[in-house]
Amino acid sequence: MNLSVPEGFFQVANRARFELRGPDAIRYLNGQVSIDIARLSPGKARPACLLTAKGKLCAPLQIWRQGDSLIIEGPSELSETIQARLERYIIADDVELLPAAQPAPLFHIVSSSPAPSLAIDRIGLLGFDTTEKPVGLPEFSLGEIELLRINRGVPIWGRELTEDTLPQEARLEDLAVDFDKGCYVGQETVSRLKSVGRVNKRLHGFLGSSELPAGVPLFLRPPGDPSTAGQITSHAHDFDMAQTAALGYLNRQFETLTRFEIADETGRVLGEVERREFPIL
């Protein structure tokens, strides 16, 4: 697989969708999420953050226009959370939030060609969704999807993203935050971090040669130093290149370092990694 310009497809699953409609839909949603809804381009989805009043993440979203409605998509395990959070501030607004069925099956094609349907970035690469199974393109395995996602630094819920995550910690501010838009829930914290503060940890990419075990906590530490510098959240091994790409949070005081050991909960060193810019490979 060519990680620089991969072309292929995978089936999209485990997504929750809602339709927001009504005369006040754009204005209302603009006050709830981190992007400027009025700037949405037809036929193109944008990532957004749904936040708490304290600026922490409720859910990572994809939002796009569909006719006169707005479609809101997020992780299926957050379906009830998304619905409750979006309905909480509907008072005198002329809007209606409804569950929206995801087409089944739904496929996502990673391609640099112009999108004939909804253009959406699902793993850090240009692509589009289609209901017809592609012909003549390779289907990505789960391992390849994970490697592509990690290589591009795309965080997902349950790994890099939790209810305690601030957008800037996960590097969501560039694609999923419009700092020049009007007020929205959680904006005060996000804007303050941009102007006068720094987060205590931040998502980084790492590259090493050792295969790492799945399903166990993995910690970053300076070489020869038992201090915990951070934690690995996702990793995938590229067998063709004999290298492991990983995502993890690095505590701010260790961001000047480039090389780290990977250790398990017992302190046993499992390998070494180098901090890398995205794309990692």
PLM regions with names:
Residues M1-V5, A48-P60, I91, S112-L118, ...:
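Short amphipathic beta-strand starts and helix->beta connectors
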Residues E19-A25, A38, S111, L207-A214:
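Short, surface-exposed ligand-recognition loops at beta-strand->loop->(often short) alpha-helix junctions
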